[in-house]
Amino acid sequence: MSKTTVIAIFMVVLVLGLVTKETQGQELCHDYMSGTELCEEDKCVAKCIWMHGTAAKGTCMPKPSKQCVCTYSCNA
């Protein structure tokens, strides 16, 4: 094989490997928490960050609701 063909095959394998690595780390988990009082957005966000780290996102279910939903990386 010529040098150009070998380099082209190497680049294809490298790019495919990087794409596969990127898509594997994007799995998200959800944690549904119910309370006794109506959900408040800032408290929901703070609780999610406390439980799952700074990358977690918290949001209240459609209002009025007593449920908070945390979304975070499953790998964390």
Swiss-Prot record:
<dbReference type="InterPro" id="IPR010851">
    <property type="entry name" value="DEFL"/>
</dbReference>
<feature type="disulfide bond">
    <location>
        <begin position="39"/>
        <end position="60"/>
    </location>
</feature>
<protein>
    <recommendedName>
        <fullName>Defensin-like protein 122</fullName>
    </recommendedName>
</protein>
<keyword id="KW-0732">Signal</keyword>
<comment type="similarity">
    <text>Belongs to the DEFL family.</text>
</comment>
<dbReference type="GO" id="GO:0050832">
    <property type="term" value="P:defense response to fungus"/>
</dbReference>
<feature type="disulfide bond">
    <location>
        <begin position="29"/>
        <end position="74"/>
    </location>
</feature>
<feature type="signal peptide">
    <location>
        <begin position="1"/>
        <end position="25"/>
    </location>
</feature>
<keyword id="KW-1015">Disulfide bond</keyword>
<keyword id="KW-0964">Secreted</keyword>
<feature type="disulfide bond">
    <location>
        <begin position="48"/>
        <end position="70"/>
    </location>
</feature>
<dbReference type="Pfam" id="PF07333">
    <property type="entry name" value="SLR1-BP"/>
</dbReference>
<keyword id="KW-0611">Plant defense</keyword>
<keyword id="KW-0929">Antimicrobial</keyword>
<feature type="disulfide bond">
    <location>
        <begin position="44"/>
        <end position="68"/>
    </location>
</feature>
<dbReference type="GO" id="GO:0031640">
    <property type="term" value="P:killing of cells of another organism"/>
</dbReference>
<dbReference type="GO" id="GO:0005576">
    <property type="term" value="C:extracellular region"/>
</dbReference>
<keyword id="KW-0295">Fungicide</keyword>
